[in-house]
């Protein structure tokens, strides 16, 4: 027997409420599984680091470090490298991967995305893009930095954020782009982590959409073939979509974002430095 109309309406409204709640909640739960921020201190701050507090365009308060060249004044550095770190921990965990750069006469600017380390807010695709773009602008406006000699260095998800920034047309002063262990597609990686969850992430932020727009800025991609977090084929795909000038380095025994760790010594560090020098002096 059919329910009277006055009894069916509350039931229908309840079902609609549950559906709407799931539509609202499920993507947010998926995002929480996708990002792995924490505020643990993994090591001491770099002794020469200047703590930098800045604000993203949407008002979120963020934390960064400016580490000047250790071989001379910051304004005489070869270039300033803006580092966008990976998807776990915070910049104190990632500092060892770039700690070798100041002694080679590079300034380094590191920062934590919203929700990571001491930065406020909650991670999101749009938020991390905002944070990365805001960090680049902070460096551009420093009086001790040559704003025409900037290098973007993104590891893992940091590379995706850098590509999205480039895709927004933000190119002023950027002389080289370096991507380490970066994925081509958010959906593909999300499905790898949680099967079927890829549709919950916005593919418009995926690096494969923007990699071609990096040119004519020189592009270096590097990836370990033993990477069990992001398969190396992602970098191979990005390389195939990119335009010249471009270079791809595949490390036979390389793991996730370990190309510049002590495990490989100076092998890939020197290749990165030589790539930057070539990008800054293309006539040589």
From Swiss-Prot:
Membrane topology: Single-pass membrane protein
Intracellular or extracellular location(s): Membrane
Membrane-spanning ranges: 12-32
Pfam families attached to this UniProt entry: Hydrolase_4
Keyword tags: Membrane, Transmembrane, Transmembrane helix
Family, similarity comment: Belongs to the serine esterase family.
Protein name: Uncharacterized protein YfhR
Species for this entry: Escherichia coli O157:H7
């Amino acid at each position: 027997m059919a329910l009277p109309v006055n009894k069916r309406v509350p039931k229908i409204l309840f079902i609609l409420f549950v559906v709407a709640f799931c539509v609202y909640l499920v993507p947010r739960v998926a995002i929480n599984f996708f990002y792995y921020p924490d505020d643990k201190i993994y090591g001491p701050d770099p002794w020469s680091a200047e703590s930098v507090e800045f604000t993203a365009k949407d008002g979120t308060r963020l934390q960064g470090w400016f580490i000047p060249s250790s071989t001379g004044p910051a304004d005489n550095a070869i270039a300033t490298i803006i580092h966008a770190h990976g998807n776990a921990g915070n910049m104190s965990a990632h500092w060892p991967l770039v700690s070798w750069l100041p002694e080679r006469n590079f300034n380094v600017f590191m920062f934590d995305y919203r929700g990571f380390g001491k930065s406020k807010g909650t991670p999101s695709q749009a938020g991390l893009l905002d944070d990365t773009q805001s960090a680049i602008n902070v460096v551009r406006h420093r009086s001790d930095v040559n704003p025409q000699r900037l290098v973007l260095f993104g590891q893992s998800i940091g590379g995706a954020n850098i590509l999205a920034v480039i895709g927004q047309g933000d190119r002023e002063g950027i002389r080289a782009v370096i991507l380490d262990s970066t994925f081509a597609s958010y959906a593909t990686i999300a499905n790898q982590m949680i099967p079927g969850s890829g549709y919950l992430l916005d593919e418009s932020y995926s690096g494969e959409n923007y990699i071609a727009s990096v040119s004519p800025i020189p592009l270096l991609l590097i990836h370990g073939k033993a990477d069990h977090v992001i398969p190396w084929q992602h970098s191979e795909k990005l390389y195939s979509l990119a335009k010249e000038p471009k270079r791809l380095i595949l490390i036979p025994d390389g793991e996730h974002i370990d190309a510049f760790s002590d495990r490989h010594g100076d092998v890939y560090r020197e290749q990165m430095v030589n790539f930057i020098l070539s990008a800054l002096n293309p006539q040589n």
